[in-house]
Amino acid sequence: KTRDEDEKLPREQPALGLLLVGERPAWIGERGDYDFYDVRGRVEAVVRALTGLLPRVAPDDTLDVDASFLHPTRRARLFLGEHPIGVLGEVHPDVAAHFDLGDRRPQYAELDVRALFAAAQIVPAPKATEPPRIPAVTRDVALLVPSATQAAALEACLREGAGGLAEEVQLFDVY
């Protein structure tokens, strides 16, 4: 084969896909359709179960053609350390229109299996430390921010503002 013939062949790689669509079951409170945070939570659980590490979710408006089926402003990349391992987000409305979904917004995630396990071996595993003399304090803070504020930007701002005092920053609600 020539180099040109190899470039014409489809690129196949093992991937793990997840699609959520419809009404999520609710054991308390109001029911609602699956959203970005539902698929993100499941992906984080899978990656943590497989690698022991929590992936970083970063917004990305420059995803390549391979992710053109995702909504351009409702998608993100997944990383372990600095290594990309997948994408997640809302399926593009033009793509969803080809299926009988009504006004539902399908949520999709795809993990590159090879990249996931390669990154898990490169990224150092967390080390155990001695328990602190003074126990940690958990704070639940409510913030009102402009609707155009990206979750990753807000998280980065909170981490920077806390300096070394915050062990973890976790955004958990959107109103």
Please report, for each region that a protein language model flagged, where it lies by residue.
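A carboxyl-terminal module marker
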Residues: 6-17, 24-175
